[in-house]
């Protein structure tokens, strides 16, 4: 049986971990690794003597892709893939998305899952022209507790994305994906929406639950948070919720 030839688009912690996994177990099938910038993934590819380059623009990408390959994978990739690129892959592209699709398509799913109290998890889906809309082939749900915030959900999604991909990838290679889930409805969010949602209006009334959810959704160590302004000053607000044992 001919081994399928693969192109990887990889970024971030998840991309690095999965590139290491693929190079360890499937190195002879990887034709090319594309990175979003010069980073550790680039170094790993170079050390493994795998062709690699940094994404510049779509024209550069198209001209530097192999003329034909079997499968493409987006591993924590931050950019949309154009139709012309999708059509080069014989069996299409698969994307790893940190939400329980069809909920929270687009940006910042860890924020919206808490803010809107939607189901959360990670998904692998076929890539179509529209963002995060292709058929879902694998999912893992992640429960949300009151102690969670945007940062903790992000970390949980990284771990589960890695686990789900390692479990699902061999099935894709062997054409053993026999069932898909329709990816319609749900919700979609643009990059700017989270920032517009993050201002606290001091004159507005909030239900306590809604305010807690908004504050913890935007709480992420080392990142900007919800904020309010007063007398020309701007203040950031974070929240920490701890579960305590009740003695009966």
Please give the residue ranges for each predicted region:
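One-carbon transfer enzymes
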Residues: 1-248
């Amino acid at each position: 049986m001919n081994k399928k030839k693969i192109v990887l688009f990889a970024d971030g912690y998840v991309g690095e971990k999965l590139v290491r996994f693929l190079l360890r177990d499937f190195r002879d099938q990887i034709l090319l690794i594309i990175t979003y910038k010069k980073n550790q993934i680039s170094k790993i590819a170079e050390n493994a003597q795998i062709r690699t380059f940094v994404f510049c623009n779509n024209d550069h990408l198209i001209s530097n892709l192999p003329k034909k390959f079997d499968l493409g994978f987006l591993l924590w990739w931050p950019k949309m893939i154009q139709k012309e690129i999708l059509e080069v892959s014989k069996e299409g592209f698969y994307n790893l998305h940190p939400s329980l699709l069809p909920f929270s398509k687009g940006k910042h799913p860890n924020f919206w899952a808490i803010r809107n109290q939607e189901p959360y998890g990670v998904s692998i889906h076929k890539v179509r022209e529209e963002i995060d809309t292709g058929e879902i082939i694998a999912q893992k749900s992640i429960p949300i507790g009151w102690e969670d915030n945007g940062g903790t959900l992000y970390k949980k999604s990284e771990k589960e994305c890695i686990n789900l991909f390692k479990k699902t990838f061999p099935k894709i290679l062997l054409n053993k994906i026999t069932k898909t889930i329709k990816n319609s409805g749900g919700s979609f969010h643009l990059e700017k929406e989270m920032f517009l949602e993050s201002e606290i209006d001091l004159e507005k009334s909030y239900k306590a639950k809604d305010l807690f959810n908004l504050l913890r959704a935007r709480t992420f160590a080392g990142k900007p948070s919800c904020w309010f302004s007063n007398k020309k000053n701007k203040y950031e607000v974070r929240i920490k919720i701890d579960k305590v044992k009740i003695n009966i």
